[in-house]
Curated annotation (Swiss-Prot):
Predominant localisation class: secreted
The protein's name in its UniProt record: Metalloproteinase inhibitor 3
Record organism: Bos taurus (Bovine)
GO MF annotation terms: metalloendopeptidase inhibitor activity; zinc ion binding
Known glycosylation sites: 207
GO biological process: negative regulation of membrane protein ectodomain proteolysis; response to cytokine; response to hormone
Chain's gene name: TIMP3
Involved in metalloproteinase-binding as annotated region, ranges: 24-27, 88-89
Record-level GO cellular component terms: extracellular matrix; extracellular space
Function: Mediates a variety of processes including matrix regulation and turnover, inflammation, and angiogenesis, through reversible inhibition of zinc protease superfamily enzymes, primarily matrix metalloproteinases (MMPs). Regulates extracellular matrix (ECM) remodeling through inhibition of matrix metalloproteinases (MMP) including MMP-1, MMP-2, MMP-3, MMP-7, MMP-9, MMP-13, MMP-14 and MMP-15. Additionally, modulates the processing of amyloid precursor protein (APP) and apolipoprotein E receptor ApoER2 by inhibiting two alpha-secretases ADAM10 and ADAM17.
Similarity annotation: Belongs to the protease inhibitor I35 (TIMP) family.
Site residues (Involved in metalloproteinase-binding), renumbered to this chain: 37
One matching Pfam family: TIMP
Positions of region (Mediates interaction with EFEMP1): 105-188
């Protein structure tokens, strides 16, 4: 069993006799949470792919050209291949070859990077400016904060390190305005709050670079 198949067993709602496309079930995740909870975060272009006969449906291995690494320097400083389940019903990811640059997040198992539908993966040209800035420095600053999902009212923060995430029931839906334009960052006084702005909240501790 590959690492991703094991994860699907925990997250999905399927049985061995039911391999429908609805088997892959993922909880919504703010891009900052996806960043902080990933071993690897990179921008890359897919330049090739190969199907390996592993597991019930195989494993798809994508060859990539890494453009930039945002997280994972000590885990795997240079990524050449990413692994995913070949079947979308097992949360396998389908990527275009020689077409787009992608923002890819994933985990490292046995020296290999794995990703899937439950990871934050997006075409680079579809990321907002705030999301690109978040990848460079803002998300990292907020990894000690907690983004608390709110699915229905009333909901409240219960500690000073929480930001209330309300995209799921807002008019914008998911991914919504907070996902696209805000980062949850610790401010003066030790409280975490949503931040959006062209300048970093504290220039003395941030190495601000353009996306």
């Amino acid at each position: 069993m590959t690492p991703w198949l094991g994860l699907v067993v925990l997250l999905g709602s399927w049985s061995l006799g039911d391999w429908g496309a609805e088997a892959c079930t993922c909880s919504p995740s703010h891009p900052q949470d996806a960043f902080c909870n990933s071993d690897i975060v990179i921008r890359a272009k897919v330049v090739g792919k190969k199907l390996l006969k592993e597991g019930p449906f195989g494993t798809m291995v994508y060859t990539i050209k890494q453009m930039k690494m945002y997280r994972g320097f000590t885990k795997m400083p240079h990524v050449q291949y990413i692994h995913t389940e070949a079947s979308e019903s097992l949360c396998g990811l389908k990527l275009e070859v020689n077409k787009y640059q992608y923002l890819l997040t994933g985990r490292v198992y046995d020296g290999k990077m794995y990703t899937g539908l439950c990871n934050f993966v997006e075409r680079w040209d579809q990321l907002t400016l705030s999301q690109r800035k978040g990848l460079n420095y803002r998300y990292h600053l907020g990894c000690n904060c907690k983004i608390k999902s709110c699915y229905y009212l009333p909901c409240f923060v219960t500690s000073k390190n929480e930001c209330l995430w309300t995209d799921m029931f807002s008019n914008f839906g998911y991914p919504g305005y907070q996902s696209k334009h805000y980062a949850c960052i610790r401010q003066k006084g030790g409280y975490c709050s949503w931040y959006r702005g062209w300048a970093p909240p504290d220039k003395s501790i941030i190495n601000a670079t353009d996306p």
